[in-house]
Amino acid sequence: MTDFLEVNRQELGLWLREEPGAFDWSVYSQHVCLIEGKGESCQEKERQLRARVKRILPIDVHQPQPLGTGSLAPLPADALVSAFCLEAVSPDLASFQRALDHITTLLRSGGHLLLIGALEESWYLAGEARLAVVPVCEEEVREALARSGYEVRDLRTYVMPAHLRTGVDDVKGIFFAWAQKKVGV
């Protein structure tokens, strides 16, 4: 497991070690269990997830070797998941494209990428700080994936209804892209 920000890696570590004060993800694991419909408890789902996480590593998607040199992560990976990262840490569309190119190096030919992100978001609040985000639309995401050597298997968007907007950002929707790295790339 990786994260761009040290503060996020620390928080993930608290959750992984089940330490007091860790963020409570149970509402999300309950939702996953409900969707899967296997009758599994959310506590069991979280236990299984914790057992699968071996390490929490820093990643810098702006570097050609995002995990740094000499990383202990087994590479190339069969699958990658990136959620709300690339657009949030990229100042412009060209940086978004480079970041996608960089994480693509971590994936084997024929491997799968699940890319989740915000649509047309230009800022979000982190405490008192207003942070810039590169606003991307569905077509820009499709084009970036193609330029990085992916075949888009599925890309769906969800428009954020006005009543769900909380004022902490200006997001218009969310995209969910499943893409496969072309063989030979």
Go through the PLM ranges and name each one:
Residues 1-21:
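SAM cofactor-binding core of SAM-dependent methyltransferases
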Residues 16-69:
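S-adenosyl-L-methionine
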Residues 73-74, 94-109:
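A short glycine-rich, Lys/Arg-flanked "PGG" loop and its adjoining helix->strand segment in the class I
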Residues 91, 121-142:
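Acceptor-substrate binding/catalytic loop of class I
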Residues 110-118:
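Conserved beta-strand signature within the Rossmann-like core of class I S-adenosyl-L-methionine
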Residues 148-185:
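Core SAM-dependent methyltransferase catalytic element
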